Amino acid sequence: MENSSTPITGLAWISSVTLCPKTYNMIVATVEGASANFVKGFNQKSAVYLGYSTVPEGLEQVITDIQMLNEKTVLPVGYAFIGEHLDPKISVPKKKRLCVKQMPMHTAETAVCEIKLSMKSKQFGAPYERIGEISGLVFWCRKGSVSAPKPTPKPRNITSGIKGLSLDSNTAVQPVRRASAPNPDAGQAVPLSNGKWGLSENAIYDSSNIYGISAIDGIPFTIHPMFENTINNSSVAASDFRDLHIKTLSEIESEYNYGFVVEKTAAARIPPRLR
């Protein structure tokens, strides 16, 4: 197994290439180049190899620890024996068994990233850890920090109206349209007379829009034409304000005074008695 920083997600015993899962790789040789077959014997035709996978499965769990147990040792809490993809006539030695501990990738701080098999005479220094020995082959593992994969954003459909609002857009700015003009095509951005941009009516209900739209977004707002000349011509606007007469409080009370005489007279009348 080459140096890698990708966490290992699965370990298993595999007896042949035909039984090897698609996501697994078999370790068929030690670091010295010798056979990594765990079935030893004279004229032995069967074989058992160690396989590993780095492809996330299910809950995207990674292997955070590996232990080798004797046949009388109780399986620790949180650990599980590695899988087996063997021919029915082949079995692995039970005197020593490999077990692994798995955790979700987003919660694990470190995970097993590399496994090596060697002969007994071979020694590795840090950061490799010696796990144990089975059938004359020594297990070594290297752990590394886990970096959770960045989520891949799903492609979104951006309407032409939103593209028109982008500062990076190379499209030409559309001519100014008045509010009385017919509605443009759905999804187009319309520049208004007040310098702001609005979306057409159909674009408001387009669920593919990447921005949140409120109930009033896209409603055009324009100033009535009779007031446009007044605002643009400062001299006319100033003259209109000079002719404006502001009434005093007494003038307002005198103009809108109402004594409620009719109502008071009607309330003072005595209703006819019932005969």
UniProtKB/Swiss-Prot annotation:
Function: Component of the ESCRT-I complex, a regulator of vesicular trafficking process. Required for the sorting of endocytic ubiquitinated cargos into multivesicular bodies.
Ranges spanned by the short sequence motif SH3-binding, renumbered to the chain: 151-156
Pfam families xrefs: DUF2464
Domain UMA stretches: 216-267
Subunit structure: Component of the ESCRT-I complex (endosomal sorting complex required for transport I).
One cellular component term from this protein's GO annotations in UniProt: cytosol
Location of this chain's protein in the cell: Cytoplasm; Endosome; Late endosome membrane
Record-given protein name: Multivesicular body subunit 12A
Record-linked PANTHER family: MULTIVESICULAR BODY SUBUNIT 12A (PTHR31612:SF2)
